Amino acid sequence: IRDRLAESLIANPNYALDDFDKIFRSKANKEVIFAFSCLTEDGSSIKISNQFYSYNHPNKGSYNYRPAGDVMTMYADNDLRKEVSITTLDNLNFVNKYPSGQTGSDPVVISRLAEMYLISAEAQGLNGGLDRLNELREKRGLDRVSPGNEADFLDAVLQERRLEFLAEGFRWYDLVRTGKATQTLGTKDYQCLMPLPSRELLYNPNLKPNNPGY
């Protein structure tokens, strides 16, 4: 069912894969399906862009989130997402998707068509989904890939999701739902689940026991 729902959006003429810089640099693009607009009044915005730049960067920010070292080398030079996704200044690495910085006027993109391509690809598997994966890669300036088996295909999809959705809140959930979090991040098994809130356990003892490890 996931691939059918994703394919229905891919077929919708209101949406299309767009140039990557337009997604985060222009309101006029056909790729974004759903996003929160940030208001201009002071104090009304969640200012997500403030989190990714240092105060010394021209965009200014609190620099609460920064890309891991391997992120800075995972993009091929011909990947059209590279300059929009990451940048470096004064030996500091930055996520570059939200350029309004401290002003916080960037929209918060929740869902866009590229995700539908990768959902469809993953749901269909190697035989049915490879074309969708490669269509997205070609749009982003990359060559087609030819994984030899389902495991390699899933790894290719997950890597593409990492490249496409850097700093958009997908990576942790991708690793957990595919059982790769402990291997990739070195987390313990119990950390892949949140604890049940003690308040809810108090009100509903039938929820006990808590998730393992808590």
Give the residues covered by each predicted segment.
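Acidic/polar-rich alpha-helix caps and helix-coil junctions
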Residues: 1-48, 61, 69, 73-214
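Mobile gating loops/cap/lid regions near enzyme active sites that modulate substrate access
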Residues: 53-56
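Glycine-rich phosphate/pyrophosphate-handling loop used in enzymes and phosphotransfer proteins
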Residues: 65
